């Protein structure tokens, strides 16, 4: 397995208020398990959902790609959810798949999807640049996990925000990046 060639960049951002159109699963553990579980729910299999999301106009992250990934505006997300499964970080969450939309979005909401308002908030970004999916995906994932695990918040004035409802985005587009965007809050 080839090692990831680039380091993980870490920075803070403020993301403006937006909407998130998505499906949600309280039991899945990762992307493949998410779609396996969703395939058991009528109308929520990967092909159906990705096709519906491709038809949504005004996706904030759409780079014009045709593949159902971050390049076409489709992303995984995790919502802090007290009734969700406990993830490897010890945080109860629900896994989601969907698209970010502007706050003034007033278009279609497919019946099997949820549309929520996400307020403006601060986030920490862990980002790895372009990589070869076949030879580097595993090593990039390891580098990203290590960067998040080892990040020292003590000198930043922030900590992870584990409040119910806060959302954590995951962008996977090997041509551009692997990016985790996690909610933070100021330390009092």
Where are these regions (language model features)?
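A solvent-exposed interaction/effector surface
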Residues: 1-188
